[in-house]
Amino acid sequence: MNKNYYAILMAGGVGSRFWPVSTTEFPKQFHDMLGSGDTLIQKTFSRLSKLIPVENILILTNEKYNNLVLEQLPMVKQEQVLLEPAMRNTAPCILYASLKIKKQNPDALMVVAPSDHWIEDENLFTENLKQCFDFCSKEDSLMTLGIKPTFPNTGFGYIEYNKSDNNPIKTVSQFREKPDYETAKSFLASGNFLWNGGIFIWSVKSIVAAFEKFQPQMTGLFLKGFENYNTNSEAAFINDNYANAENVSIDYAILEKAKNVYVLPATFDWNDLGTWGSLHEKLDKDENNNAVVNATVLLNNSSSNIISTSKDKLVIIDGLEDFIVVDKDNVLLIYPKSKEQEIKGIVASLKK
């Protein structure tokens, strides 16, 4: 394996649209959402380790999930787990991890990947990632893997690339925020828009240079502790300084400003597993389009539902269509799939 290959696995999210299974104490990346025997973070780590040395995969997560990471990924050492003492979006944590890697290996090439996505053909993913690494090793570039849209989704940001670019790797024209439905339809009709899946590839030299140019204040904050990285004093420096970083995404902080941004349209099948509905799409279904995770079910006159319970639960349903049925601990959720985006708000209101 190439010792210059590194990965940053983003594992700090809560996944509140998957409540009541995904909670602040035990978020979705640490669950076996697909009923496959592996949690989402385990599947993602395994996928990345086909190309990247295990010791070069860093896990970025919240302090409260440290034990969960070490339990589910026993091959990972504590120094590979980067703990955020405060939630500051994606730019600060990516800069922190990039500087830590740069100190260890100035020639490093790295991928930033979410820990909770579903990818069908892992060999194609590996091929695409290798193609991006090869490009970034030769060019001063910031790359992303774009996902070919299959319908006008209003829940994703979009990447517009140069229509006249006939190369496999395209020049990015601009990043577009989550659109309304009509705008999303126009994006698909244009033919040069991709979903932003949040998978980024670059050399540490290129990303650190971009931070120095576009985020000098944030870069100064984290460079102040450069001598502490990969030493026993790293945690103390991060605890004392991390919360002072601006709360900003990598898209807004860097990618929307830089001119050397490229995209490779991915050839693998992808799903962000962001909602119960998206999980329903990827699970095996019966002849009436019902998907079941763990439960034993008896279904009559019911279709297009997703049912998730513990393995010892018997669920009997009659006359239900397009619903989410989730039984977890002391919560039973029965909710229309068409209103699944409301679940996040329900969780917030329950906390008040």
Each model region followed by its residue ranges:
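Residue-level signal for inorganic ion chemistry
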Residues: I41, A97, D116, I159, ...
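Conserved core of the sugar-phosphate nucleotidyltransferase
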Residues: E122-N239, Y262, D312, P336-K337
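Short beta-strand segments
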Residues: L9-A11, L60, V111-P114, T144-K148, ...
